[in-house]
A protein has these predicted regions:
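Long, highly charged low-complexity segments
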Residues: 1-96, 100-101
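Active-site-proximal helix-loop-helix substrate-binding element of RNase H-like nuclease domains
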Residues: 7-8, 62-64, 68-176
């Protein structure tokens, strides 16, 4: 039997669908340590015309469904694109927001979002990639899903992506 601290995140989780609230969230995140994750749309990916994965090309599109952003135990937001909020708005906010540090489960795939920021050697502590850190601690594991990393290194029990979505992908889940 695994003992883990209670996860109260769901009590503070807020879904944002309007521009005014999204603006307030980003303003509140200023000068904080910010964790984020991008929920890609179907067209996002490093694919070449023949469908092969490319390691060196920019993503095919900047379209995505949402950005999750968290900067305290009580400030946990899921900002959805839609009628009022566009992918380009979220890109601009991520690109221009001044924070103490950025933390992401797969920061490497999101570095292009910081195109206006010149990342220098002195900035190393400002960008933290959870998957790279988990790999450096234990390179023998084949994959590093967020729920396993949270359990192994934080003692938190989180539901997996499969637990939340079942057989759906994010695009279908957002439509339902």
């Amino acid at each position: 039997n695994v003992e883990a601290p209670k996860n109260n995140a769901e009590e503070h989780f807020v879904v944002v669908r309007d521009l005014k609230t999204a603006e307030r969230v980003f303003e509140k995140a200023k000068d904080r340590e910010v964790a984020f994750a991008v929920v890609p749309g179907e067209s996002l990916g490093n694919s070449e015309s023949d469908g092969q994965l490319s390691l060196f090309s920019e993503p095919a599109s900047n379209d995505y469904l949402a950005v999750s952003i968290c900067f305290s135990e009580e400030d946990i937001y899921f900002i959805c694109t839609g009628d009022e909020i566009s992918s380009s708005f979220l890109d601009e906010k991520l690109n221009t927001l001044e924070v103490k540090s950025w933390i992401a489960p797969d920061l490497k795939t999101n570095l292009h979002r910081f195109k206006s920021k010149e990342i220098k050697a002195d900035d190393r502590g400002r960008y933290f990639d959870m998957m790279v850190a988990a790999y450096l601690i234990n390179p023998l594991v084949g994959e590093y899903p967020y729920d396993a990393v949270a359990k192994d290194y934080l003692g938190l029990m989180l539901s997996s992506k499969k637990d939340y979505l079942g057989k759906l992908d994010f695009t279908r889940m957002m439509k339902e």
